[in-house]
Amino acid sequence: MHIIIAGIDTDVGKTFVSAILTVLLQAEYWKPIQSGSLNHSDSAIVHALSGARCHPESYRFSHALAAHQAAQIDNITMHQETITLPKTDASLIIETSGGFLSPCTHDSLQGDVFAQWPCHWVLVSKAYLGSINHTCLTLEAMRARNLSILGIILNQYPKEEEDWLLRTTGLPFLGRLNYEKSISKATVQNYANLWKETWKYRDTLLC
């Protein structure tokens, strides 16, 4: 099973979720596009937290900007056809960059590029002012593309807002993230253990 981790925005917990799922599903990891933090990339973080095999990025940029902007600064021409799924027999966790409809190449959106692959999707939403609106808009865009959505992971939401989102979106609840002062291998393993029961039924969760 290949799963794409999409977020309602940047910095909503996608890398943390990716590390947890590589442990839970004994999966490999791939981030197609890395912008900025090349010495402390998301692939390096996931590997350190989970020990998972991490496939090389298709593109690596020196500045933490939208891909098309970062590519321009680094004088790199991006080609959609070079962003291809790694060959592996293992399950694969694929992490997007930024929000679902973040720019990819100069004339494409990330969600449209990744939507071509035969993968399931998980949406990650983090609580902040405006996050419910961003969650509903992102889900609307995903459903408009007829994506196979497994469900949603909610990061630091109060219980009443969790209930509202789940009731309104109709998405299966796949896990909850709490505020963590620091994240370690033990933290990741603890979440993998907590989420085990829900993810046992992942094949029946599609919506």
From Swiss-Prot:
Positions that bind Mg(2+): 15, 42, 95
Claim: Nucleus is one of the keywords in the record: no
Reactions catalysed: (7R,8S)-7,8-diammoniononanoate + CO2 + ATP = (4R,5S)-dethiobiotin + ADP + phosphate + 3 H(+)
InterPro entries: DTB_synth_BioD, P-loop_NTPase
Compartment(s) of residence: Cytoplasm
Pfam family, one: AAA_26
Protein name: ATP-dependent dethiobiotin synthetase BioD
Alphabetical list of SUPFAM superfamilies matching this protein: P-loop containing nucleoside triphosphate hydrolases
Lineage: superkingdom: Bacteria
Assigned keywords, A-Z: ATP-binding, Biotin biosynthesis, Cytoplasm, Ligase, Magnesium, Metal-binding, Nucleotide-binding
Active site residues of this protein: 31
GO cellular component, one term: cytosol
Enzyme nomenclature, EC number: 6.3.3.3
Subunit structure: Homodimer.
Function: Catalyzes a mechanistically unusual reaction, the ATP-dependent insertion of CO2 between the N7 and N8 nitrogen atoms of 7,8-diaminopelargonic acid (DAPA, also called 7,8-diammoniononanoate) to form a ureido ring.
One GO BP: biotin biosynthetic process
Co-factor requirement: Mg(2+)
Similarity comment: Belongs to the dethiobiotin synthetase family.
Binding of ATP, residues: 11-16, 42, 95-98, 155-156
